[in-house]
Structures are given as C-alpha cells and as structure tokens.
A protein has these predicted regions:
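Small/polar (Gly/Ser/Thr/Ala-rich) solvent-exposed segments
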Residues: 53, 76-97, 109-138, 153-156, ...
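Bacterial Sec-pathway N-terminal export signals of envelope proteins
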Residues: 32-88, 95, 99-100, 109-111, ...
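N-terminal signal peptide c-region/cleavage motif recognized by signal peptidases
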Residues: 26-29
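Periplasmic alpha-helical coiled-coil/stalk elements that build and connect Gram-negative outer-membrane
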Residues: 2-5, 36, 137-251, 345-348, ...
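Acidic, low-complexity, intrinsically disordered peripheral segments
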Residues: 1-12, 87, 401-431
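Amphipathic alpha-helical coiled-coil segments
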Residues: 54-69, 130, 137, 141-164, ...
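Membrane-embedded beta-strands of outer-membrane beta-barrel proteins
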Residues: 104, 299-301
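Short, charged, amphipathic alpha-helical segments
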Residues: 120-124, 187-196, 385-393
Length: 431
C-alpha cells in the first residue's frame, strides 16, 4: 500500500501538470494569438524569402544583358598623324610636306540583324530560365513549409489527445483511491492506473517536444509568427490539379528549368553558327594637310578573314552542339525521374487516404464500443477498473493510429499539391 502511495505521489502531480495546466495554457495562451492557417504560412514564407527576391533580380539582370547585347558596339573615335617627315628640311613639320596629314575618324563595327536578334533572344531565354528557377525554388519552399506546418499540427493534435486521456486517468486514480478506502478497489489496480498515468505523461512530453521541434523548424521561414498555434488542417483529400493528366509532368518547375536550359543551349548554337559570318567594321576619316594642299576624306571597310574555320568557328559550333545534346539528355532523364516520383507519390497519397478512411470506418467504432462496454461492465459490478483503463487506452491507441495515417497522408498530399505552384483548374480527390 505504501509503495503504491509513493508511486502515486510522484505520478499524480506530473499528470495534473499535463492534464490541467497544459489544457489551461492551450485555452488561454493560444487564445491570445490568432491561429496560423497553412495558406497564411505559405504566403508569409514567400514574402520573407530572400531567395525569391534574388531570383527576381537574376531575371531582371538577364533581360538587361540581352537588351545590351542586341545593340551595336560603341563607335570608335580615332586620331592620328600620317606621314610626318623625320629628316630633311621639312623635319617634323606638319604642313610643309604634301603627304603629311592630321587625321580624325570614326569606326563602327556592324553586326548582322540576325545576330543581334539572337543576342537579344538569348537574354530573354536566360530571363525565362531564371523565372523557372524562381518557380522551382518557390515550389520547394512551399513544400518545405507545408510539411513543417503539418508536422506541427499533428504533433499538437497528438498532445491534445493524450491530455484528454490523462485527465480521464486522473479521474480513475481518484476513484480507485476512494474505492480502496471503502474496500471496492485494491492496491494492484491503483498501481496499474499509476503506471498508465506515467506512460501517458511521457507520451504528452514526447508530443510536446515534437511540437516544439516543428515550431523551431518552421520559424526558419516564418519568424516570430511560428509561435502562433496552427489553424485548421487543409483538405488533404483533394489536389489542386489532376495527377492523372499527362500534361502535369511538363508543368513541373524542375522540368521547366531544364527545358529553358535546352532552349538556351540551342540559342547559343545558333549564335555559334552565325559566327561563321564575321562582323564588318566601317571607318570614315577626315585628313587635314598643309594650307597649300587639299584636305581629304577616307572611307574604309574592315572584314575579318576566317582563315582556319575548322579550328575556330567549327569547333565552337561543335561545342555548342555538345551542350545542346547534354541539355536534352538532362531534360529526358529528369522527365523520367520526376514522372516516376510523381506516380509513386500519387499512389502513396491514395493508399494512405484509403487506409485512414478504412480505419475510421472499422477500428474507431470498434475501439469506442469496447471502451463503452468495459465501462458498463464495471458499473454493473462485472468488470474491473483496470479493464476500463485498458479499453480506453485501446481507444486512444486506435485514434493515434488513424491520426498518424492522416498525418502521413497530409504529408504525401503536400508533396504533390505544392509540386506545381501555378495549380490547375481541375481538382482530383483521392478515391
């Protein structure tokens, strides 16, 4: 009897702490803070992300480079002295000899319109690639935030479930103590209830630890708002797009990034092919001679001569062709990889949804009925309080099993639902 009383003295205060104080904290402390819904968490994370801002600047930089590359080079202003005598009677004179001229000219390098259009197009494609990178970063951010939010939500639900059971166990311990006093209960029953109380307190502690860890994880993206309690769970039975639509794969951000990489490589190839046609330079010069002689104007054209195209231009084209082949191979590999991942994630999501619904239809009613029957038997004098606790613990375990399945289904849903950031008009529910 003294041993049982000692155990109870150690367990019961902790049990009260979790079953009463924690419930009061949830009721009062969280009431002062507005719940944080998943959509709000996603929006807040995006607004705080410096990576997304950096991607916007990268796209802007690519556009600016493309516009600059499409312009003609700056003209070159040229000055010079031609044919200055260095000996004889007219040594160093700038006006005595008829061949001596002071020259000023302008030279302009001219690229073909097609080449300049390609340079501008390259900047546009590079900007589109940066936008695709931004969308891929955004999709990853939304997925990570959603997973952390879901982990925190279900950790809180788990703690709440164990707190309710802890309060029930507390009542049973009180009843057992009264029963021992009037001879209806015995010490072994009380010890068994106190063991359940200790186990329940540990479960609450573990769930609260998981909730704190999830809060710390999500604070990386949300800052102080991570301390707000989670709002209602999202509808994890419906996706924002039809996973059976073959076009979904092409809209995945990772696929779009590699598709833009391929387009960029193809643009570089076209530029390399236009490199066979050299850029011309046109020069106009004005030459001033001595007062006794006429001034002159010169016009000239400079054309590079590709003497060894097989060693320069052709090798540049071959390098660009290899880059195109590499980009296409990476795109095809990513399509296969992401297609397999998408199919696997869809099957996992549907399977978890089916299992959770099946247990809700079968296991939960059975466990609840068993707990009711155990209590009725005890009230009628045909059962024991230990049997009541066992049945109620079984009911809690059943609800925990369903809760874990719902959490896993919600995580699978998040990986699918936020794989696309643009969504789709159609929705598809899990069968």
């Amino acid at each position: 009897m003294s041993s049982s009383f000692g155990i109870h003295q150690r367990v019961r205060p902790a049990l009260r702490q979790y079953a009463v104080v924690s419930l009061l904290f949830v009721a009062t402390g969280t009431a002062a803070q507005e719940p944080l819904s998943l959509p709000e968490a996603l929006k807040l994370a995006e607004s705080r992300s410096t990576l997304l801002v950096g991607s916007d600047f990268a796209a802007q930089a690519a556009r600016e480079r493309g516009i600059a590359a499409a312009q003609l080079p700056d003209p070159v202003l040229k000055f010079g002295l031609d044919n200055v005598p260095i000996n004889g009677p007219d040594q160093y004179s700038l006006t005595a000899d008829f061949m001596t001229m002071r020259r000023v000219g302008v030279m302009q390098e001219i690229s073909s319109t097609e080449k300049r259009d390609l340079r501008r197009r390259r900047g546009e494609v590079e900007a589109e690639r940066e936008i695709a990178v931004r969308e891929a970063t955004r999709a990853g951010l939304r997925t990570d935030v959603a997973l952390a939010w879901i982990d925190r939500y279900y950790a809180q639900k788990t703690a709440d479930l164990w707190r309710v059971f802890a309060a029930d166990v507390e009542l049973q311990i009180t009843a057992l103590q009264a029963g021992i006093a009037n001879g209806r209960s015995n010490a072994p029953e009380l010890r068994a209830a106190e063991v359940v109380a200790a186990q329940t307190a540990d479960q609450i502690s573990a769930a609260e630890q998981q909730a704190r860890m999830s809060t710390t994880a999500i604070a990386r993206w949300l800052g102080p708002a991570a301390a707000r309690p989670p709002g209602p769970a999202p509808d994890a039975a419906t996706l924002a797009f039809d996973p059976d639509d073959p076009a979904v794969l092409a809209r995945l951000p990772q696929i779009t990034v590699l598709r833009q990489e391929s387009a960029l490589a193809q643009t570089d190839l076209r530029l390399a092919e236009h490199g066979r046609t050299p850029d011309w330079s046109v020069e106009v010069a004005y030459q001033q001679r001595g007062p006794a002689y006429s001034n002159m104007v010169s016009i000239g054209v400079a054309i590079p001569l590709p003497m060894f195209p097989q060693e320069r231009q052709d090798r540049g084209i071959a390098a660009s062709q290899a880059q195109v082949a590499q980009a296409e191979a990476q795109l095809q590999d990513m399509q296969v990889q992401r297609g397999a991942e998408l199919a696997t994630n869809v099957e996992e999501w549907r399977s978890l949804q089916r299992r959770a619904k099946a247990l809700q239809r079968t296991l939960l009613p059975y466990a609840s009925d068993r707990a009711v029957q155990a209590l009725a038997s005890y009230s009628g004098g045909n059962g024991t309080l230990a049997g009541v606790l066992e049945a109620r613990r079984g009911s809690v375990d059943a609800r925990m099993q369903v809760l874990l399945l719902e959490r896993d289904a919600a995580r699978a849903w998040a990986k699918l639902n936020f794989a696309l950031v643009d969504g789709a008009q159609r929705t598809r529910s899990a069968p």
